Amino acid sequence: MNLQTINDVASELFDSLKQQKIIQPLTDRYPEIDIKDAYQISRQFLSLREAVGEKVIGKKIGVTSSVVQEMLGVDQPDFGFLTDAMRVQNRSTFSIEDSLIQPRAE
């Protein structure tokens, strides 16, 4: 992916987050997307979140189970960031319908 496409995709993801709308999977529109592209998009997406005041408070790792990796067609875990806007305090409650799009648990 070229830099413009990476920036455009990150902006689209950021807009969909703010508007709480579902978008077509990136792999459907960009079948050539690879892990390098994904991490570049993630870094740009984080920059957009930081530009509106979010702060990085941690890192995350996902897709650690071989069963989940097989289900998703990948062969390694993925790594990402956590911002203060993603924080949910212990024992607090929130509405899944109002907060999450296609929630999943590993």
Q: Over which residues does each language-model region extend?
A:
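Active-site microenvironments in enzyme catalytic cores
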Residues: 2-106
